[in-house]
């Protein structure tokens, strides 16, 4: 009942601007464009500042290109073995040969097997199974006792 009253008050007090279900689509479609920028007398809007703005844009592009060059072209180091990988993958002469590497692969069989978590899981499964069996047995016992009392 309290929940119904809260919902009713919410619907009654909801306005179209705050939490209402009415959406004014025309308001969202309007574009606000400043058409009268010429009234501002600053260097941003003068023709004299066009060269300055072009120089700033050019400087930004050069800086972005420098960042891209640093990130992608100069990143390939000796440790990535990029050239070796390309030779192995794309050369026809190395199809019969295998590539040698000093990096050892991950071998799961040599990993140390830990038995303690398995012991804990088996004890937990055993206790859960025992609890379920005990609950079923206790439930049947109480049903049998109540049936005996009702027969007397």
UniProtKB/Swiss-Prot annotation:
Keywords: Cell membrane, Membrane, Transmembrane, Transmembrane helix, Virulence
Membrane-topology annotation of the record: Single-pass type I membrane protein
Sequence intervals crossing the membrane: 115-135
Main subcellular location: membrane
Ranges of the Cytoplasmic topological domain: 1-114
Compartments where located: Cell membrane
A cellular component term, taken from the record's GO annotations: plasma membrane
Anything else known: This strain lacks esxB and esxC.
Entry function: Component of the ESAT-6 secretion system (Ess). Required for the secretion of EsxA.
Entry's family note: Belongs to the EssA family.
NCBIfam families cross-referenced by the UniProt entry: T7SS_EssA_Firm (TIGR03927)
Protein name as it appears in the record: ESAT-6 secretion machinery protein EssA
Organism in which the protein naturally occurs: Staphylococcus aureus (strain MRSA252)
Lineage: Bacteria, Bacillati, Bacillota, Bacilli, Bacillales
Name of encoding gene: essA
